[in-house]
């Protein structure tokens, strides 16, 4: 974790593999001459705090949104007010959503958290987004490119 200033904190190397997306199985990293499954230690997440509210920005959330959120809560001492991230629940190699059981389990975890709003991008996938929307209701919104948000 690196606190850049009073408003910005970046962290990476998220531990835990709870509700890990199977879409990660096809993603590799080069280590020496080998290509093991990518552990995403390099993936960075950003906490932005302004006017007493904190937003988590987590890119495609390859480490799993549940694991990233837990790390963010450990850093903050509480849940962020909003999360902006793809949830990585669509497997582009196979052209399909992650299994309903995984999507539903992610939805249950997010529903039980104290985050006010989640905004998610393309790598969540349309089918997974619709399932999550049924669980999270107005707490979940889409994040198309060029959008403006107020937290």
Give, region by region, the residue ranges found by the protein language model.
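Short secondary-structure boundary/hinge segments and terminal tails
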Residues: 21, 91, 128, 150-151
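Cap/insert and terminal regions of metallo-dependent hydrolase folds
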Residues: 39-41, 45, 49-56, 60-145
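Non-globular, low-confidence helical/coil segments that flank catalytic cores
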Residues: 1-6, 137-151
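Active-site-proximal loop/helix segment associated with metal-binding centers of metalloenzymes
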Residues: 3-51
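Proteins with a high burden of low-complexity, intrinsically disordered sequence enriched in S/T/G/P/A and R
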Residues: 1-2, 24, 103-106
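Active-site donor-binding loop signature of nucleotide-sugar glycosyltransferases
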Residues: 13-15, 85, 145, 151
């Amino acid at each position: 974790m690196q606190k850049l200033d009073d408003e910005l904190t970046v962290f990476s190397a998220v531990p835990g593999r709870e509700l890990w997306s199977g879409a990660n199985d096809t993603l590799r990293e080069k280590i020496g001459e080998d290509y093991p499954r990518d552990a995403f230690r390099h993936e960075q997440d950003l906490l932005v705090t302004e006017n007493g509210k904190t937003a988590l920005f987590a890119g495609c959330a390859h480490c799993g949104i549940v694991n990233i959120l837990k790390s963010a809560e450990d850093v903050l001492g509480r849940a962020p007010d909003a999360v902006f991230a793809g949830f990585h629940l669509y497997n582009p190699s196979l052209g399909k959503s992650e299994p309903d059981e995984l999507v539903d389990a992610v939805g249950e975890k997010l529903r039980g958290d104290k985050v006010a709003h989640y905004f998610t991008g393309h790598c969540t996938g349309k089918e997974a987004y619709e399932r999550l929307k049924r669980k999270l209701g107005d707490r979940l919104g889409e994040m198309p490119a060029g959008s403006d948000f107020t937290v």
